[in-house]
């Protein structure tokens, strides 16, 4: 079934708003067994909307449209839909009743401007909207049933689930299945080389690469009838990818790390400098983290490192705050202060200033202290301040996960 998506709004084309609606629609259609063949974005211009609807209506069997159903003068979608369908706008008493009831719950009376939301193409079918003022509607344009919904994401998502998808699902073939493998610490070119020949030529399993910095996602897709081949391919990729694979599908690094920490029975403390609490935020984002996470210190200044972590001032003076020696002292100090089994520290130069020839912007030291040792490693990351901080946070989580996995699989340490 040929399905298209039409997004309407000046704000989408000016870069003011990211079109999350189109992504959500495509994902839900895929899960239901459909696939978006074409996606257009047009401004709040009646002529542009009519042209887009006419074009998509001639080439599709279903068109899902979002945006332009509000009460303001630039909301022109209903008018354009009527023109493209060869009909007129008329006052929908059902839509007007919905507007009046909605207004009574919120403000007590309907604003005159909202009445124009009840002007809909003659003969259209209505799509209920329990969360907002704008009802959706369905009209036939060319060869396609066109489903119109408001651009407000939470309203659109509810209408998609309750009305649009149930109607379309019966017209789709067998559903698609997907496996997402999430990788870190390896480049796309290296992945391609590692996976060469993993999926036999002629296989009906599709493989796509998706970069979501600092992660790389490998997305395997196949129809429901090819589920065994999909699982076989996923198993082969897991075997080849090894430690680069940190999570799958909806699982995040945080979730996998939380599971390992719970299984280990170890407690953790943090000492962060350049990441400013980002690592602690990721760890505590998982419910139940209080079972293993004791405390986090953001010791941004040298004085804080000394006061909170007992890092000796002469050590900082001799080696600098961004150094292996100070990272080690931070981790050891954090572990002693918290009374934890483990302590992870980070100190670095996120930029844009502060770099030197010896320690350029992007220089980061991580340290992990346990009962018997303290491991320290230097990293040199590229990018602006946000990217350096982001990849530092992710590297720290991955580093800790690797430690826990090694401990789990080493006899006598698990």
From Swiss-Prot:
InterPro entries: CinA, CinA-like_C, CinA_C, CinA_KH, Competence-induced_CinA, MoaB/Mog-like_dom_sf, MoaB/Mog_dom
Pfam family, one: CinA
Cited CDD domains: cinA
SMART domains assigned to the protein according to its UniProt record, in alphabetical order: MoCF_biosynth
Gene3D superfamilies xrefs: 3.30.70.2860, CinA-like, MoaB/Mog-like domain
Similarity-based family: Belongs to the CinA family.
Protein's recorded name: CinA-like protein
Organism: Geobacter sp. (strain M21)
Lineage: Bacteria, Pseudomonadati, Thermodesulfobacteriota, Desulfuromonadia, Geobacterales
